[in-house]
């Protein structure tokens, strides 16, 4: 009775007011699963293709009726009768059905919507939580939140070049305590910014986006907020950055427009070294451009034993890109975004490859999110140890944190919060 009876896709809105794909998969016994697909603002050139209508008369060209139609008319009819419990078989069939290396024919947003909805329907059929279905009996690690509380770059209209300034409550003893600590720092940051006369409106991911004077000032106000909340920077709470350096890379140089300077890869590495020496920074994501492999190698040689170096645009949740990084010895961590690759199975394969090679994994949202909480379950399913899903603000972000609170409650005394121990490959 776990055979697929019906597949229905529709166009819904994401947290930015842009259309995205939602899919329902209904099984023979009436059990069903629903999934909504996220969308990024800062996207890697090597990501799977998100199919948009490009019709300027609808949603400024951002409609997804073609992707929806591909599910309803092509994918749906093709997988009727398939066993929802065969996730690998269904995902492989979807990849074959599309037939392109980047899912450009049917759209990664169409394929992922189906893949996620199938997994949810299967979990519901078995009466299991999604994290347990995907991860098995040992899925019990609650992730440390990487909370993006200050925004710059593509996520904000200000003169800060670094895209995200995050806090990580690694000194907490449980996920719920970490969430509370993060929320307290977030509220204190609002007070700090207000006191300095800065705007406290929030950006796409719930973080503040004030017009600060420099990247360093952003770190300084966060350190002040951590202390104001009664915590010790570098002991209770650490700082993580997402530079999104591909967005800064022009003609072989990294252009920091907010600061009016341009730097070579070697100068960027020196810049990061100085920041890490001065502030409690434990993680830098996309510190170099996605195609600057030499820059990445230098960065890894200089900082790879001391802090987490995360590849997002560099790896785009893709096993081939990750394997290249492993072979070249660059980065030591990978950001996992379901919609960068387009199926649950490929995502799990990438996580497995990272694990086998000593890379940490961070499960991540996109800047355009929905109320879907799949990634919270995925983080626990694979014992990732870290999750990146925005500030403790805006329902689209908080939905994931609330799901993790429920999972922690359900796991009870078996739940593990690793905190600093999640960084198993650096001398933290």
From Swiss-Prot:
A single MF term (Gene Ontology): phosphopyruvate hydratase activity
Top-level EC class as recorded in UniProt: lyase
Necessary cofactors: Mg(2+)
Pathway note: Carbohydrate degradation; glycolysis; pyruvate from D-glyceraldehyde 3-phosphate: step 4/5
Compartment list: Cytoplasm; Secreted; Cell surface
Residues of the active site: 205 (proton donor), 337 (proton acceptor)
GO cellular component: cell surface; extracellular region; phosphopyruvate hydratase complex
Residues the entry annotates as binding Mg(2+): 242, 285, 312
Keyword annotations: Cytoplasm, Glycolysis, Lyase, Magnesium, Metal-binding, Secreted
UniProt keyword Glycoprotein present: no
Note on cofactor: Binds a second Mg(2+) ion via substrate during catalysis.
Statement: the UniProt record of this protein carries the keyword rRNA-binding: no
Lineage: superkingdom: Bacteria
Binding site for (2R)-2-phosphoglycerate: 163, 337, 366-367, 388
SMART domains: Enolase_C (SM01192), Enolase_N (SM01193)
GO biological process: glycolytic process
Pfam short name (any one): Enolase_N
Annotated catalysed reactions: (2R)-2-phosphoglycerate = phosphoenolpyruvate + H2O
Enzyme Commission code: 4.2.1.11
Summary of the function given for this chain in its UniProt record: Catalyzes the reversible conversion of 2-phosphoglycerate (2-PG) into phosphoenolpyruvate (PEP). It is essential for the degradation of carbohydrates via glycolysis.
HAMAP family, alphabetized: Enolase
Assigned protein family: Belongs to the enolase family.
PANTHER family, alphabetized: ENOLASE (PTHR11902:SF1)
Annotated protein name in UniProt: Enolase
Organism: Carboxydothermus hydrogenoformans (strain ATCC BAA-161 / DSM 6008 / Z-2901)
